[in-house]
Amino acid sequence: MSIADIRTDYTQAKLSELDTDPDPVAQFAKWFGEALRAEVPEPNAMSVSTVAANGRPSSRILLIKDFDQRGFTWFTNYESRKGQELAQNPHAALLFHWIPLEREVRIEGRVERVSSAESEQYFQSRPVKSRLSALASSQSHPVADRTALEAQYAKVEAQYGEHPPRPEHWGGYRLKPDYIEFWQGRASRLHDRIVYSLDKEGKWQRHRLQP
């Protein structure tokens, strides 16, 4: 079988305007809850896409840690490639892909750092070894080899033990959405796409897109 012959026909569900909540965050909460109940592997995993000042895009998988009316929140190293790109261009796109449910959610908007207090609270809730890794790794920067990386970790572990502090370059981002699209796979590639976009008055407008 060639790659071109690999395909799946989606038949599980449908999505109409009447099925969706007027509030896209509430609609996301509904779908996220259904992904949890369906035991979708890592339902909180999302692709985060950023764009550098020269227009070159990059994407990576991260885990969302919170969402509410303020936006969608995750935590990372501010000195990483994504952190540097967000400093240059504070807009990003998120993508959740729940394969067992044949669903996707696309979210676009402006990104801001969360408060130091919020970053600190989440950092202290992480497992100790994850906190040590945040100190040991200069994310997205070159390292000689795995041995050198593990040596950096061992040094940090010896220094801080069970109480590693949050580095200043580590914290949270929150994306304030202005565009959210809910995609439900359908048969014959005639998929359902319901989009919410903010109008000039800051109100959500809902409409359907052709697949």
UniProtKB/Swiss-Prot annotation:
Alphabetized InterPro entries for the sequence: Pyridox_Oxase (IPR000659), Pyridox_Oxase_CS (IPR019740), Pyridox_Oxase_N (IPR011576), Pyridoxamine_oxidase_dimer_C (IPR019576), Split_barrel_FMN-bd (IPR012349)
Domain of life of the native organism: Bacteria
Cofactor list: FMN
Metabolic or biological pathway: Cofactor metabolism; pyridoxal 5'-phosphate salvage; pyridoxal 5'-phosphate from pyridoxamine 5'-phosphate: step 1/1; Cofactor metabolism; pyridoxal 5'-phosphate salvage; pyridoxal 5'-phosphate from pyridoxine 5'-phosphate: step 1/1
Comment on bound cofactor: Binds 1 FMN per subunit.
Residues that, per the record, bind FMN: 60-65, 75-76, 81-82, 139-140, 183, 193
Enzyme Commission numbers on file: 1.4.3.5
GO molecular function list: FMN binding; pyridoxamine phosphate oxidase activity
Reactions catalysed, as given in the entry: pyridoxamine 5'-phosphate + O2 + H2O = pyridoxal 5'-phosphate + H2O2 + NH4(+); pyridoxine 5'-phosphate + O2 = pyridoxal 5'-phosphate + H2O2
Enzyme class (EC, first level): oxidoreductase
UniProt-listed GO biological process terms: pyridoxine biosynthetic process
Assigned keywords, A-Z: Flavoprotein, FMN, Oxidoreductase, Pyridoxine biosynthesis
Binding-site residues for substrate, renumbered to this chain: 7-10, 65, 122, 126, 130, 189-191
Gene3D superfamilies named in the record: Electron Transport, Fmn-binding Protein, Chain A
A Pfam family reported for this protein in Swiss-Prot or TrEMBL: PNP_phzG_C
PANTHER family (alphabetical): PYRIDOXINE-5'-PHOSPHATE OXIDASE, PYRIDOXINE-5-PHOSPHATE OXIDASE
Subunit organization: Homodimer.
Family according to the record: Belongs to the pyridoxamine 5'-phosphate oxidase family.
Functional summary from the UniProt entry: Catalyzes the oxidation of either pyridoxine 5'-phosphate (PNP) or pyridoxamine 5'-phosphate (PMP) into pyridoxal 5'-phosphate (PLP).
Protein name per UniProt: Pyridoxine/pyridoxamine 5'-phosphate oxidase
Highest classification ranks of the organism: Bacteria, Pseudomonadati, Pseudomonadota, Betaproteobacteria, Burkholderiales
